[in-house]
């Protein structure tokens, strides 16, 4: 919510360039949102790179994909060595009204001591953006079952059932030589379904990955600015949305801290 309240996000794709200069990238950034595959040269661990399924923040020279905020910072620092390709979008504040509606509601339920609704609203606030980048689980079975109660549970599906549905040889279960794949079964409003999270899944309906990518990019850049304010040598640990520092350095972030305001 801290970045969603005031940030702007990709709305409509306007161009795709296979190559480009840094100057052209700056022009696009001034007009809207951009995602770019770039070669980075840096001594600062400020840029994300997915390596072997893990998110890393390396130094040196590497190729990665950056969103608007990280691109602006990289260009300002002179860390963009080469632009391989980029996507340009128009931009709009997609989540401002969402945060304006639900953040005060969360504060209200917290003040009332209503933990159930406070946590429910917190989930709504924090999870909406991820829906734009969500992958669809492989649907193994779906059918009517009006007699079954609402439920959700883990289950297993034998490999022969799945051989024609997805590349099962890529699953962790296959690597362990197991004869089944882990799956989930659920029932809701008269429909029964079995799904599995497997390699090669498609994007979910109504997805737009650049939106979700920009939210996480803005959050990482905000966290990076806080780390610079504290001093990298004083950061003991950082995670998705938090820092662990010694209390003596807290005053350096005083202007950014508030009990209730974003």
Task: Give the residues covered by each predicted segment.
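Conserved acidic
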Residues: 1-262
